[in-house]
């Protein structure tokens, strides 16, 4: 980590349903705590969807795997999306996302005073990680799933920024319309100061 990130090519058919891993810090817990209130609620679902792609459909259909809110077995949602591909590149990537998701579910409970429905699935993922169709390997640099028309890409720093700073720029330029921290966490210092990088 700490290297300049390389954007994965985002195919038009995968960006239609945007998924992301908001790596606002290399530390998975800190990255969760930095997310705005809206993302804390939304990303619990997306991270569960990303982690589901690590398991075969037959494993997801087994009786011990928690069902969706509608009572159906979990399916693979957008498995060719860059964030899904990154999650499955190595067990280290998967473990980073598990730690990040765990911290995000904690944030959800802190900010909204209730348990998120997907938390049971995350617990199942942790218990069954060795059933995942993911090879052991090192943590790779985060994928950047930010569309080409995003405002942050017009910032002269974007092309040379680390993955963390690219996502911070994304927050600063593209998420300010709804990025609020009103549920028990202050906005991160870098967001308050609109500053990224060293």
Name the predicted role of every residue range.
Residues 5-80, 84-198:
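Sequence termini and other peripheral, non-core segments
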